[in-house]
């Protein structure tokens, strides 16, 4: 049992996978459609039914012929559709075989080894490449040809429009001609209006006459149809009478044969009655014993049924418990798997945290070592610093002594100068030497001052360079720290990404497991629902069987009671058997005839039921075909609606163009166009009225012929009525010879009459008993049929509800699939976006890695990076300048204050102009005092004056 259940579950899962893969379509109702190509129309139920209706007089011959013609047309249409379906199926089979072959060849080509390169493969690659190039060239050529054709068509349209544009002289001539024609047309229109009024009055009178004649004609046609139906009915009466005569003769022969058989049976019955009397006593005893046994068996049966119902309930409870335990087991398995996976994840996280902890400990030790080394280096540098300070203090400071020494020397020099000036005896040569020495001394002093300034500047520059170097080293250290932090963050982010990817995979896996579990639960639920339905059906069937058995028991009891009565009656009949033999024979004959009539009626009703069933199947097939046609029509309507919308859009565009062109026309042309339209409309009305007049004139000769036929038919009808009246008078005439017919034989005496009345009363009592029995059987059968009808109606409602539910579920499934497809599309888009972002991240990582490697090597960054950075700076500067300029423009536009303090909204006048000379640059020059007039060229006297040469300023 478990193996079979697992197999069925696997099969159901495979079927569901196939259903999920396959697209959802509307389910066509399953109907066994027969092949109409091999059907004989004369043997169809529709033709037979029509013939029967015609024979019964319910359907006229003309209507029957019209219905037959319609049925043959429909049959031909069905045959053509079936042939087309067969052809399409053959084509589909052929095409599927071709597709399978092509797919097989493609698979062989795909499975061909890639590494195996031969000359044939190279040639094939070249051929494919050239074929692709050739196809691309063909497509380009087709597009170019299409564009060329469209441009040619546009050119032709433009040329036609240009030709249509009339010249002003021609327009005036046309206007004059059109005005003259409009005046003439107005006069004609006035005349036509008068004529139309007269014609309308005539037409109104003719229409009234025509309506009266049409009413009379309709009455005559209706009377004619009635007469035709009566004629057809009267024609079928002799045929029916002949058939009835044949049936009566056959029945007469059969009854004579049966009479002989019944006489023999009566003899045998007299012998068997004696035996039956002996058997009846034994049967009564057996009957009592059987009734007792039946009651005992019935009690046992009820007990067994109760036990069976209890066992069925226990079985259903066990199945439900099994299903719940299976679902709980599946849920526990899922929870166990998830817990194991969570355990594994926690273990991985713990190991990762331990690794990170160990790595942090190592880094901490390294940092401690580096700190120790840096402390030692700091102590050494502090010792060096103190030593250098001591050395600096030990160096003597000669700045003050040198300055004092220099001042003393200056004083001595000045004293010497004074002494030399006071000495008058010194010669000229000595004075020159003294001057030279003084000049040299001044030069040396100036050089000394310059050198001092240079020394001071150099000291400042060295200090600045040292500060810059320290700043750069600090920046370098900060950049290194940032880089290390970024690398750590990147690694942490990579780890987080991996963790999230793992979680995502686990979530997807859990979702799949939940989906599988949901599918299994849904399958089990469907199974239980089906089992419940089957159980309900079985219970209902058992109840129906129980009720049927009870009804049968009641019928058997009633039949037993009736048999007891019959036995009593038979005992009475046996006493009076000799006297009542002749009456019994007559009764038997009548009963046999009635039974035959009942059998014939039953056969006729069965035939009618079969015909109706066939007609129902045919109608259902027609409904299916009509539904298909309706669906095709709806599709065609939707397509035509889409095309109509497109055409309407194109028409709207064309209408817009036409409106633009019509606006360019003159008002006179519009009025003329309106007048022409009115004239055309009036002409159309006149033509329509003339057509109506012609139709009425054509109908008049047909009316005369119909009047003549009607008069002939009325004469015939009056003759028929006169003939019928004469026949009735002859039949009712009291003085006729055949009016009365005396019965032969002797009159009965009173005793004989009393005896005959007693016999008739006995016969009447028997007939009443039989009628009561038949009424009872009829009531029982009618009860059963009513129950069956109510059940069938209830089943119809159930089927309708089920169909509605199925349609609702199909709609839900369709909506769910559409939503799933949309979500899948969104997911694919998101996946593509994530892939692109991952690519960008990788590129950025590579870029950062290259930058870091260059920084570590001590190389400068790429020139492209520098250019991009400069571009960014330049863009920022440009953006700031543009914002400032815009703000200034807005302020100027708001203020617009003139030099004299007056505010104005007028635009400023130009203060400069660009010269037209080719040699000079196009730089703006001021107008001068007489703006906006350009300054005049210098005169002839100004040409010979030289402009002063401005000397450069020496600093």
UniProtKB/Swiss-Prot annotation:
The keyword Coiled coil applies. Residues 114-141, 169-321, 400-461, 534-640, 667-832 form a coiled coil. Residues 1-22 are annotated as: Disordered. Its main location: cytoplasm. Essential for sperm flagellum biogenesis and male fertility. It is linked to Spermatogenic failure 94: An autosomal recessive, male infertility disorder characterized by reduced progressive sperm motility and multiple morphologic abnormalities of the flagella, including irregularly shaped, short, absent, coiled, and multiple tails. This is Coiled-coil domain-containing protein 146. The lineage of its organism: Eukaryota, Metazoa, Chordata, Craniata, Vertebrata.
């Amino acid at each position: 049992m478990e193996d079979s259940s697992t197999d069925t579950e696997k099969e159901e899962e495979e079927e569901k996978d196939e259903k999920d893969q396959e697209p959802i379509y509307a389910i066509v109702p399953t109907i066994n459609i027969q092949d109409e190509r091999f059907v004989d129309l004369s043997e169809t139920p529709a033709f037979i039914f029509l013939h029967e209706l015609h024979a019964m007089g319910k359907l006229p011959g003309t209507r029957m012929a019209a219905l037959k013609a319609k049925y043959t047309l429909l049959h031909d249409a069905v045959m053509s559709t079936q042939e087309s379906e067969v052809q399409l199926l053959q084509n589909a089979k052929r095409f599927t075989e071709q597709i399978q072959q092509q797919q097989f060849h493609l698979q062989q080509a795909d499975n061909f080894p890639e590494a195996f390169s031969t000359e044939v493969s190279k040639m094939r690659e070249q051929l494919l490449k050239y074929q692709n190039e050739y196809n691309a060239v063909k497509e380009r050529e087709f597009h170019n040809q299409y564009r060329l054709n469209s441009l040619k068509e546009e050119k032709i349209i433009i040329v036609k429009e240009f030709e249509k544009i009339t010249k002003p002289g021609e327009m005036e001539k046309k206007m004059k001609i059109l005005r003259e024609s409009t005046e003439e047309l107005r006069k004609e229109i006035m005349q036509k209006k008068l004529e139309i009024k007269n014609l309308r009055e005539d037409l109104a009178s003719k229409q009234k006459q025509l309506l009266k004649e049409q009413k009379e004609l309709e009455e005559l046609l209706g009377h004619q149809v009635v007469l035709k139906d009566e004629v057809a009915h009267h024609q079928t009466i002799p045929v029916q009478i002949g058939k009835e005569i044949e049936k009566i003769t056959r029945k007469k022969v059969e009854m004579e044969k049966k009479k002989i058989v019944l006489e023999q049976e009566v003899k045998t019955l007299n012998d068997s009655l004696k035996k039956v009397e002996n058997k009846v006593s034994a049967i009564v005893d057996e009957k009592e014993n059987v009734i007792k046994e039946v009651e005992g068996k019935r009690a046992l049966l009820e007990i067994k049924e109760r036990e069976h119902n209890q066992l069925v309930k226990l079985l259903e409870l066990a199945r439900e418990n099994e299903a719940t335990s299976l679902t709980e087991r599946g849920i526990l398995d899922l929870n166990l798997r998830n817990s194991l996976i969570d355990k594994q994840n926690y273990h991985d996280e713990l190991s990762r945290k331990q690794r990170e902890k160990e790595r942090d400990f190592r880094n901490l030790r390294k940092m401690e070592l580096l700190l120790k080394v840096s402390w030692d280096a700091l102590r050494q540098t502090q010792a060096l610093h103190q030593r250098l300070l001591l050395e600096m203090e030990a160096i003597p400071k000669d700045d003050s002594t040198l300055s004092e020494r220099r001042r003393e020397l200056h004083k001595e020099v000045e004293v010497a100068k004074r002494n030399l000036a006071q000495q008058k005896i010194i010669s000229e040569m000595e004075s020159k030497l003294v001057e030279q020495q003084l000049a040299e001394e001044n030069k040396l002093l100036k050089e000394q001052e310059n050198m001092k300034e240079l020394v001071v500047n150099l000291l400042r520059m060295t200090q600045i360079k040292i500060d810059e170097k320290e700043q750069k080293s600090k920046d370098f250290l900060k950049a290194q720290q940032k880089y290390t932090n970024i690398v750590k963050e990147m690694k942490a982010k990579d780890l987080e990404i991996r963790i999230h990817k793992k979680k995502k995979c686990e979530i997807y896996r859990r979702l799949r497991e939940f989906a599988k579990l949901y599918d299994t639960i849904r399958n089990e639920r469907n199974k239980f629902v089906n089992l419940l339905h089957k159980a309900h059906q079985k219970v209902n069937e058992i109840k129906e069987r129980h009720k049927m058995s009870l009804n049968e028991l009641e019928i058997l009891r009633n039949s037993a009671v009736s048999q007891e009565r019959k036995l009593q009656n038979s005992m009475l009949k046996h006493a009076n058997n000799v006297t009542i033999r002749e009456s019994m024979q007559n009764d038997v004959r009548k009963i046999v005839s009635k039974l035959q009539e009942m059998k014939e009626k039953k056969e006729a009703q069965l035939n009618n039921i079969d015909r109706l069933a066939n007609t129902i199947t045919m109608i259902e097939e027609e409904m299916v075909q009509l539904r298909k046609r309706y669906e095709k029509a709806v599709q065609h309507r939707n397509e035509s609606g889409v095309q109509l919308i497109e055409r309407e859009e194109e028409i709207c565009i064309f209408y817009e163009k036409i409106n633009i062109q019509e606006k360019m026309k003159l008002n006179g042309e519009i009025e003329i166009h309106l007048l022409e339209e009115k004239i055309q409309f009036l002409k159309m009305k006149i033509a329509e009225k003339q057509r109506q007049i012609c139709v009425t004139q054509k109908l008049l000769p047909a009316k005369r012929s119909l009047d003549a036929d009607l008069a002939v038919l009325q004469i015939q009808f009056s003759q028929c009525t006169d003939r019928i009246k004469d026949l009735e008078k002859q039949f009712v005439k009291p003085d006729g010879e055949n009016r009365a017919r005396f019965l032969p034989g002797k009159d009965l005496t009173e005793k004989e009459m009393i005896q005959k009345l007693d016999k008739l009363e006995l016969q009447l009592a028997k007939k009443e008993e039989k009628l009561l029995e038949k009424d009872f059987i009829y009531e029982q059968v009618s009860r059963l049929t009513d129950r069956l009808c109510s059940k069938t109606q209830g089943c119809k409602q159930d089927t309708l509800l089920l169909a509605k539910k199925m349609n609702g579920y199909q709609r839900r499934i369709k909506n769910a699939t559409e939503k799933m497809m949309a979500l899948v599309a969104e997911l694919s888009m998101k996946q593509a976006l994530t892939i692109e972002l991952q690519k960008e991240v990788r590129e950025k990582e590579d870029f950062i890695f290259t930058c870091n490697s260059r920084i570590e090597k001590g190389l400068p960054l790429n020139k492209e990076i520098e250019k991009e950075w400069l571009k960014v700076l330049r863009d920022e500067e440009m953006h700031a300048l543009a914002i400032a300029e815009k703000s200034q423009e807005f302020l100027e536009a708001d203020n617009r204050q003139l030099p004299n303090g007056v505010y104005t909204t007028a635009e400023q006048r130009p203060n400069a102009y660009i010269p037209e000379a080719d040699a000079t640059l196009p730089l703006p020059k001021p107008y001068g005092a007489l703006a906006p007039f350009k300054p005049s060229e210098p005169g002839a006297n100004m040409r010979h004056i030289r402009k002063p040469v401005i000397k450069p300023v020496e600093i």
